[in-house]
């Protein structure tokens, strides 16, 4: 298992929340969606990105 950081933009307060999830090294996007649905009040309809534990990047547009 590895630490995967899942960042979610909370549109209610315009802040980015970062969660740490334990996942297998071959995790897929669907795994993060399932984790969000089970462990937070966010769903896959929210905007989020994932990074492995060695790097967290933020892209501004």
Segments (PLM) and residue ranges:
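Short, mixed-charge low-complexity intrinsically disordered segments
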Residues: 33-61
